[in-house]
Design a protein with these regions (language model features):
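A glycine-rich (often HGG/GG-containing) alpha/beta subdomain
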Residues: 1-144, 148, 152, 328
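Inter-motif core of Ras-like GTPase G domains
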Residues: 284-308
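Generic preference for hydrophobic
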Residues: 67, 107, 221-223, 246, ...
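C-terminal-of-GTPase-core extension/linker across diverse P-loop GTPases
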Residues: 2-8, 12, 52, 140-262, ...
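Short glycine-/small-residue-rich Rossmann-like dinucleotide-binding loops
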Residues: 239, 274-275, 299, 306, ...
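Conserved beta-strand segments of alpha/beta enzyme cores
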Residues: 106, 267-269, 353
Length: 456
């Protein structure tokens, strides 16, 4: 990390300002070459802002700027950092960056600033991953959870469990290495009890992973039904935009339409599908097959029925194809009067909630959000104090740790020797260390930071 790096940290495009970040042991020296104000930045106090101009090597003014000086170690990277706020716009910010690079800085790689924060011990790996989750957050709940992770909520819970296991492993190793010494041995009951407590804590975190993934990525929700029941109208109503064509002609939607929406804080990836029915039309038939695949791929299925019509064989076929999925059954067109078959559908719906709505007027759609929140326990997540696992890498590591600790408890119960039991305890320690970065490989670290944008 001897190189001093620089990059534009704000999104490229037209805006009020752009920020160019410089980090490294030559940050102040390089900034002094390009920044001209009342005082040299190398003589400034930490965390101070200075007015001046950026000039290129020929002494030509590039822009009027504000420069913020932050001295190590109290910076994001724990290195000397200078952030230069320029006028927004692609041309100006790129010209300022080019001037800084020519003065001796190196162009930062994707995620290199955050990687330096990790390597310099300011944040652990799970906190580094939270940075990109904050940037990519699509709703308030996921943003709040990512911020909590950045502040160390998940790291703290992982560290608490891992520290107990490290202590346990150390005590066991002493007993194994010096069996004849008169040492204060840890009992087998202590090993079992602590291991089981740690396993339960790991499992508690693991249980949040499925809901956590939804917070991060959204619920893939397929809207299905026979033609002309109001699927496209529902998509348009929820998206608050005319995303799908709506006509009285059956079979208008022939391909899949996807739309990301935020439904009262719930992230949904809505998939409007072609009407499911038997057809001889080649193009429509392809659309129907895609609809069936959408049902298989969906996290949640919304089955649309036409409450103004009779319940026919095509409706029953859709209900049969979705009975094993997380689903909500919507009886549409309630604005035309009460459906005559609502009670019959509820009787055969099993655990699937049934709701009368009007995609045209919006009646009942507020209750749809409540149902989805209940199905995925999103209300409990929002109200909970514990960390939420949103990253599949973390989920995999927690699952490995849980399995190892389960083997510890089961091994003790059948009289397994301590040196064998200790192997699984160390496996659990390593798995938990993968989350925070203590035991992770360089390849994984590089892969994680490669997913970042340049400038972060």
């Amino acid at each position: 990390m001897e190189r001093t790096i620089a990059a534009i940290s704000t999104a490229l495009g037209v805006g009020g300002i752009a920020v160019i970040r410089i980090s490294g042991n030559r940050a102040l020296e390089i900034a002094d070459k390009v920044f001209f104000g009342k005082d040299k930045l190398s003589e400034a106090q930490t965390h101070t802002v200075h007015y001046g101009f950026i000039k290129n090597a020929d002494g030509v003014k590039v822009d009027e700027v504000l420069a913020t000086v932050m001295l190590a170690p109290k910076t994001f990277t724990r290195e000397d950092v200078v952030e230069i706020s320029t006028h927004g716009g692609v041309t100006t910010s790129k010209e300022v960056l080019d001037t800084i690079i020519k003065a001796g800085a190196y162009m930062a790689m994707p995620g290199e600033f955050t990687k330096r924060a990790f390597l310099n011990g300011r944040i652990d790996l799970s906190q580094a991953e939270a940075v990109i989750d904050i940037i990519n957050a699509k709703n308030e709940l996921s943003q709040r959870n990512a911020l909590s992770q950045l502040e160390g909520a998940l790291s703290g819970e992982i560290a608490e469990v891992r520290d107990k296991l490290v202590y346990l492993a150390a005590q066991m190793q002493v007993t194994i290495d010096y069996p004849d010494e008169d040492l204060e041995d840890i009992t087998i009951d202590d090993i079992r009890r602590i291991s089981d407590e740690c396993r339960k804590k790991v499992d508690t975190l693991l249980k949040t992973a499925d809901s956590g993934k939804i917070l991060r990525d959204g619920i893939k929700t397929a809207i299905v039904g026979k033609p002309n029941v109001g699927k496209s109208s529902l998509l348009n109503s929820l998206a608050r935009a005319e995303r799908a064509i709506v006509t009285d002609i059956a079979g208008t939607t022939r391909d899949i339409i996807e739309e990301y929406i935020n439904l009262n804080g719930i992230p949904l990836i809505l998939v409007d599908t072609a009407g499911i029915r038997k057809t001889e039309d080649v193009v429509e038939k392809i659309g129907v097959e895609k609809s069936k695949r959408s049902i298989e791929d969906a996290d949640l299925v919304i089955v649309m029925l036409d409450g103004s019509d009779i319940l026919d064989d095509e409706d029953r076929e859709v209900l049969a194809q979705t009975h094993n999925k997380n689903r909500i059954i919507l009886i549409n067109k309630s604005d035309l009067g009460e459906s005559k078959y609502t009670a019959a559908v509820k009787a055969k719906a099993g655990k699937s909630p049934v709701l009368e709505v009007s995609a045209k007027t919006g009646i009942g759609l507020d209750k749809l959000a409540e149902l989805i929140r209940d199905i995925y326990s999103l209300g409990e997540l929002a109200a909970g104090d514990s960390a939420i696992v949103t990253n599949m890498r973390h989920k995999s590591a927690l699952a490995d740790a849980s399995e190892a600790l389960t083997r510890v408890v089961e091994g003790i119960d059948i009289g397994m020797p301590s040196d064998i039991v200790s192997i699984d305890i160390n496996m659990a320690i390593n798995s938990l260390g993968e989350i925070t970065g203590e035991t992770v490989s360089d390849d994984i670290v590089n892969k994680i930071f490669h997913e970042f944008c340049v400038g972060k």
